[in-house]
Amino acid sequence: MERFENCLYREVCDYEEPCRNACVRYSVTKYMLEHSNIPKSKWGIHKLIPDECDMKAFENLAYIRDNIVEFTDNGHSLYIYSDTCGNGKTTWATKLVLQYFNEVWEHTGYNARGVFINVPTFLYQCKSNISRPSQEFEELRDSLFKVDLVVWDDIAAAKISDYDFSTILSILDSRVYKQKANIYTSNISPQHIESYVGAKLASRISKGITIQLKGGDKRNGSTASSSFENLSV
């Protein structure tokens, strides 16, 4: 029963209850999640209801979600930005990765397929790893060159150093060359990101689909029109 209570699919799974101990969907998805670096608080179903000003943005994000395999297979790039914190950028990015896991689990085996990176934390860990090497971190960093889909959360949170620049550029250059998909979240508009990360990184990050969220901070209890509830996911 423990397996059933902790399964992300318990409310939508069409398999008979009780869960089988050898459920492949559960074990493969759990493996992908455990190797994704997605915070456990983001593993479950988080409903988002857009403010009226974000209706079109949510529709566009829902379209990408519904076609996430095509998005990923074609190596597309998505830049979600807003000058407001807490209005769904990170939640949407993780939703897209989770949907990808949901679509590909049956043909995945026990392999990492997507990774979530909080950019400020990752850059700090890169520097710390020089003096205090961590095999777990090195495996995470190496996976960024290989997995199908990477979320770069909170990119351009601050101006980056030359070391930070070379670290991210080497990974992104490899991913772009291999046609690997990337999702970025930021509080900086595409027009201003160059002043934070430089021209080379800016050209890679902002090249692709850009979606702006304008709504209020959902973490502080911002309300939204119930007429858009059908768009909540």
What is the meaning of each model-derived region?
Residues 55-62, 81-87, 100-146:
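Short glycine-rich substrate-engagement loop in P-loop NTPases that contacts/grips substrate
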Residues 72-94:
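Walker A/P-loop nucleotide-binding motif
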Residues 95-99:
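Active-site signature of alpha/beta-hydrolase-fold catalytic machinery across serine-
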Residues 113, 146-149, 178-184:
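Loop/turn-to-beta-strand initiation segments
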Residues 1-67, 209-211, 218-233:
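A short, basic N-terminal segment
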Residues 71-72, 106-109, 142-145, 173-178, ...:
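Conserved catalytic network of the ASCE P-loop NTPase/AAA+ motor domain
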